[in-house]
Amino acid sequence: MKANSGLKKNRTKIQMVLTALVILSVVRQFFLGNYHNMFLGILTLILFMVPQFLDRKLNVTIPPGLETVILIFIFSAEILGEINAFYVKIPIWDTILHTTNGFLMAAIGFALIDLFNRSDRFSIKMSPYFVAFFAFCFSMTVGVMWEFFEFSMDWFFGLDMQKDWIVPAINSVKLNPTGANVPIHVDVQSLVVNGETWNLGGYLDIGIVDTMKDLIVNFIGAVVFSVIGILYLRNRGKGKLAASLIPQVRSKQEEELSSRDQ
């Protein structure tokens, strides 16, 4: 209980600091006249309230450890990534966030299926491995849907959500001068766009590498959480790390106490 209380206090402190930084960012963007970034800041403040909103409205307790990760993830994606251009300044920033996203989406999927698994309304009890597998599939589905969204925004609205990637060499059947169905290795030093030569040190890939990289790291994040979930279900209540990261279904007594507090 003391450890959990300490986590809650730390979560509250982190949330207060992040909220203050977001408010300062919103004010700054307003005076700079950058209303798009100001809107992103306001959206961030709204997203900060989502975990506690779900905690109150659903019969689920979001542990302080997981909520802290969610808050830092939102801040890193919107304020640091978008407004402060960390996606451009730090090449691996996008990779870090997609890995974290895979982890978080697996946590959400785990909570959803575990809620059904522990409900008295359902007679079927699922094994820890099936619950973890569902969490993994849920995370990967969300990751794929996000890549669909990025492609759609780039294709229909002329954005660049699927970041460019410099590929120094390619293996291609199309470029084989013999016409045989055998790929040949081609080193690429420059490319020509509308008659203008760009010495980028490679071929400019406009989305395939970025998409596959995002899905691979999403896979890694989902696998990591799924393993944690299996250990948690097999030793429910014993693992401190797992308990601090996995949403839990509240009992009827806990739900009644929560309702009274509100």
Language-model segments: which ranges?
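Membrane-interface helix-boundary motifs at transmembrane edges
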Residues: 4-6, 53-65, 120-126
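Cytoplasmic-side transmembrane-helix entry/capping segments in multi-pass membrane proteins
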Residues: 40-42, 61-72, 95-98
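Alpha-helical transmembrane segments of multi-pass membrane proteins
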Residues: 48-52, 73-78, 135, 139-146, ...
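Membrane-interfacial alpha-helical segments at the cytosolic side of multi-pass membrane proteins
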Residues: 100-117, 155-161, 220-234
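Short, highly charged, low-complexity non-transmembrane loops/tails of multi-pass membrane proteins
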Residues: 239-260
